Regions:
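Active-site neighborhoods of divalent-metal-dependent phosphate/nucleic-acid chemistry enzymes
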Residues: 2-4, 86-133
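Short beta-strand segments at enzyme active-site cores
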Residues: 45-48, 132
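Active-site-proximal, substrate-binding regions of enzyme catalytic domains
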Residues: 58-88, 96-102
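Structured helix-beta-strand junction loops
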Residues: 40-41, 83-84, 141
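Short loop/helix-cap segments at secondary-structure boundaries that form the rim of catalytic
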Residues: 136-144
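Histidine- and aromatic-rich ligand-binding microenvironments
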Residues: 12, 111-112, 134, 147-156
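Short, well-structured N-terminal submotif of metal-dependent ribonuclease cores
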Residues: 1-10, 14-46, 61-75
């Protein structure tokens, strides 16, 4: 497990969506959060599942008036991956075990599998803070702190 740094925050899929799509209701706040992170030397943790979810959602014409093409979505993901401010956090054997322990221990159902996986990956890499618009997805997991994407940035 990587050492915990107080200047890393995990991002959830809603942040990537809001930052990318002008039509997203949290677009301005996502941009404000990113500016805040950059000004405060805060690294952003990403994990594969949020990138996959981003591609799945941002290309869906039923959700957005102007969805991205698959090529555009993958280009956005590659830009995030190549940014020096970002750290890719990969699943580990320990994070997988933790995910299943949490699913059973907190009695979570099938609709919480991905959120629990995201939290477990970040936690195993020492990241216990997540920027999201879905705080309730993580609220039951002890030790995970969420920051509201729709709110103005605040000290982390």
């Amino acid at each position: 497990m990587a050492p915990r740094t107080s200047t890393t925050i995990g991002v959830d899929t809603p942040f990537l969506l809001a930052h990318t799509l002008i039509e997203h209701p949290n677009h301005a706040s996502a941009r404000a959060w990113l500016a805040y992170f950059l000004a405060n030397n805060t690294s952003l943790a990403l994990c594969p599942i949020i990138l996959d979810e981003f591609i799945h959602v941002v290309t869906d014409a039923k959700r957005f008036e102007n969805p991205l093409s698959m090529d555009q979505a993958i280009s956005v993901v590659r830009d995030w991956l190549h940014s020096k401010e970002n750290v890719l956090q990969l699943p580990t054997e320990e994070s997988i075990k933790l995910q299943y322990d949490w699913l059973l221990g907190y009695r979570l159902g099938r609709k919480r599998i991905h959120d629990t996986e995201i939290a477990a990956i970040y936690c195993q890499h020492g990241v216990t803070r997540i920027l999201t618009s879905n705080a309730r997805d993580y609220s039951v997991i002890e030790g995970i702190e969420t920051f509201d994407l729709s709110a103005q940035p605040k000290a982390i």
